[in-house]
């Protein structure tokens, strides 16, 4: 008579923690294996597993040489008034927009760089 995987799982589920530990030790001894978790070699592999970023912050680093054009671009992008946009540009580096998607962040960066600003997307 053959035992199914489900029957084995049910039997293990009914065991106490000590019984499971003894079972694991017996399996390690019988099959010559170790139940220790495998160690992943290399830090680069771990870095590749990080989720892709979906929200970005657009940071105005500096206004550059054409401050008036940058203020106009900031007003158009954010809907701020003239005074608020000027204060934001004068206070650079400052966050311009936060939590936007990649396409919007790239479009905003291109628009501001065209006006002469230095912009970072993080």
From Swiss-Prot:
A single Gene Ontology CC term: cytosolic large ribosomal subunit
Keyword Ribosomal protein: yes
Pfam families per UniProt: Ribosomal_L12, Ribosomal_L12_N
GO molecular function annotations of the record: mRNA binding; structural constituent of ribosome
The organism's place on the tree of life at top rank: Bacteria
Ligase as UniProt keyword: no
GO biological process terms held by the UniProt record: translation
UniProt keywords, alphabetically: Ribonucleoprotein, Ribosomal protein
UniProt cross-references to InterPro entries, sorted A to Z: Ribosomal_bL12, Ribosomal_bL12_C, Ribosomal_bL12_C/ClpS-like, Ribosomal_bL12_oligo, Ribosomal_bL12_oligo_N_sf
Family, similarity comment: Belongs to the bacterial ribosomal protein bL12 family.
Summary of subunit composition and partner proteins: Homodimer. Part of the ribosomal stalk of the 50S ribosomal subunit. Forms a multimeric L10(L12)X complex, where L10 forms an elongated spine to which 2 to 4 L12 dimers bind in a sequential fashion. Binds GTP-bound translation factors.
Function field: Forms part of the ribosomal stalk which helps the ribosome interact with GTP-bound translation factors. Is thus essential for accurate translation.
Protein name, as recorded: Large ribosomal subunit protein bL12
Organism per entry: Vibrio parahaemolyticus serotype O3:K6 (strain RIMD 2210633)
Gene behind this protein: rplL
